[in-house]
């Protein structure tokens, strides 16, 4: 469970596309490109790699 590990911000993440940020809280699906991971890249947030 990645709850709380990601949050939506201005879409700056070039590696995030479409709904790759499935670990983000509800409401972030439409802002997947702006998914910013607070956890290390080694976390379960695949969209943050």
UniProtKB/Swiss-Prot annotation:
Span list, region Alpha: 17-49
GO MF entries: metal ion binding
Highest taxon of source: Eukaryota
Biological process per Gene Ontology, one example term: cellular response to cadmium ion
Pfam families: Metallothio
Binding residue positions for a divalent metal cation 4: 20-21, 31, 35
UniProt family annotation: Belongs to the metallothionein superfamily. Type 1 family.
Entry protein name: Metallothionein
Taxonomic lineage of the native organism: Eukaryota, Metazoa, Chordata, Craniata, Vertebrata
């Amino acid at each position: 469970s990645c709850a709380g590990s990601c949050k939506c911000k201005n879409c700056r993440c070039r590696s995030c596309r479409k709904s790759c940020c499935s670990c983000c809280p509800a409401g972030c699906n439409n802002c997947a490109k702006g998914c910013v991971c607070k956890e290390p890249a080694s976390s379960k947030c695949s969209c943050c790699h």
